[in-house]
Swiss-Prot record:
Name of the molecule in the record: UPF0355 protein SH2586
Annotated source species: Staphylococcus haemolyticus (strain JCSC1435)
UniProt family annotation: Belongs to the UPF0355 family.
Domain of life: Bacteria
Phylogenetic lineage: Bacteria, Bacillati, Bacillota, Bacilli, Bacillales
Entries under InterPro entries matching the protein: GSP17M-like_dom (IPR025889)
Residues covered by region (Disordered): 105-135
């Protein structure tokens, strides 16, 4: 289950990310959600996902026409109760920040077993095994 941390100030995001990494989460397991686009220079070159629920102008227009809710769309990825979804949605709309840590428990064994890119091939070749001219 995902671990949600609600923050009031943007400056606190770095501390929480460092804390989550110390707890064993990798950068690709961390998501920062905000109402508007974040400009965090230290995170743009990392694997931490930054999500702005307001989106671009065209996103806002399509949401207006379809009735889709950006906050709920982001929170739908996590198995939350209706009460939790409403609480976190309110936090986002109030200008707070969510740092979500979600362990990736998927296994890549199947890919490694079935992908030929991971296959180790013995490519030793001796001259006496070829049918061509021998020197």
């Amino acid at each position: 289950m995902a671990d949600f941390t609600v923050l009031d100030k943007q400056d606190e995001i770095y501390n929480v990310i460092d804390k989550k990494k110390a707890e064993g989460y990798s950068e690709n397991e961390l998501v920062v959600v905000s109402k508007s686009k974040l400009h965090l220079d230290n995170l743009h070159d990392s694997q931490v996902t930054l999500i702005a629920t307001s989106g671009s102008f065209s996103d806002r227009m399509s949401k207006l026409l379809t009735g889709e809710d950006g906050e709920e769309a982001v929170l739908a990825r996590y198995e939350l109760s209706e009460e939790q979804t409403e609480k976190y949605k309110k936090d986002i709309l109030d200008g707070k920040f969510l740092v979500i840590a979600n362990k990736d428990n998927s296994s890549h064994d199947e890919v490694e077993e079935n992908n030929s890119a991971y296959e180790e091939i013995d490519i030793t070749h001796y001259a006496n095994e070829s049918k061509g001219p021998k020197s």
